[in-house]
């Protein structure tokens, strides 16, 4: 079962030189046209749950080019035109640390393209929304993410408020993402260093 392509992702990102996707999946590829495309994902021992799910969905397992967590990327500053993720940011205990790292790696004018599960359209429905104050408390807590659970839960407006509170510039928002439909899309553009 493959999901449709995102028209918004193609509009913004097609023909980029370098794209990095955090946590790509074979059953839900973005199919963006670029010169270089890297899939960054957790080391193999942490990917077992996702690989089993991909096998069940019948599309095989996405090839991983770089095995690291998404908070410590082995790319130089201003390297990529875009970093993309779909249903990944909620797995970070400290999502701002991840976003700051992704921001470091993208070029000025580049994009961070995020699809995140919407609290009311996923199994997170019964959970409380993660507040900005909770995120602030997590900033200095060292924690090794195992990637298997949702540490954060948002609705579209909560996520947008959070990223803006930390100085990120949001250029595009879809309350219902145009790829899977159970999340929302937020696109951040690099204007200057944070």
What does each model-identified segment do?
Residues 88-89, 118:
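Hydrophobic adenine-recognition pocket in adenosine-nucleotide-binding enzymes
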Residues 1-16:
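Conserved alpha-helix/loop element of class I SAM-dependent methyltransferases that forms part
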Residues 72-77, 104:
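Short conserved loop adjoining the S-adenosyl-L-methionine
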Residues 57-60, 67, 96-101, 107-193:
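S-adenosyl-L-methionine-dependent methyltransferase catalytic module, highlighting the catalytic core
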Residues 83-84:
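Hydrophobic beta-strand segment of the Class I
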Residues 16-18, 78:
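Nucleotide donor/acceptor-binding cores
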Residues 14, 93, 107:
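Short conserved AdoMet
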Residues 18-72:
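Class I SAM-dependent methyltransferase SAM/SAH-binding core
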């Amino acid at each position: 079962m493959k999901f449709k392509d995102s028209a918004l992702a193609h509009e913004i990102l097609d023909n980029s030189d370098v794209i990095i996707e955090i946590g790509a999946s074979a059953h839900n590829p973005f199919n963006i046209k670029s010169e270089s495309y890297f899939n960054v994902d957790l080391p193999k021992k942490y990917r077992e749950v996702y690989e089993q799910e991909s096998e069940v969905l019948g599309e095989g397992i996405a090839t991983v080019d770089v095995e690291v967590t998404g908070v410590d990327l082995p790319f130089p500053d201003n390297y990529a035109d875009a970093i993309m993720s779909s249903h990944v940011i909620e797995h970070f205990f400290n999502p701002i640390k991840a976003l700051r790292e992704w921001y470091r790696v993208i070029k000025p004018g580049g994009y961070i393209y995020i699809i995140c599960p919407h609290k009311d359209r996923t199994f997170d429905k019964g959970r409380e929304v993660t507040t900005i104050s909770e995120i602030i408390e997590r900033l200095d807590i060292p924690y090794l993410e195992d990637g298997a659970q949702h540490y954060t839960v948002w609705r579209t407006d909560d996520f947008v408020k959070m990223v803006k509170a930390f100085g990120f510039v949001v250029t595009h928002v879809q309350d219902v993402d145009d790829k899977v439909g159970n999340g929302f899309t937020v696109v951040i553009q690099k204007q200057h260093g944070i």
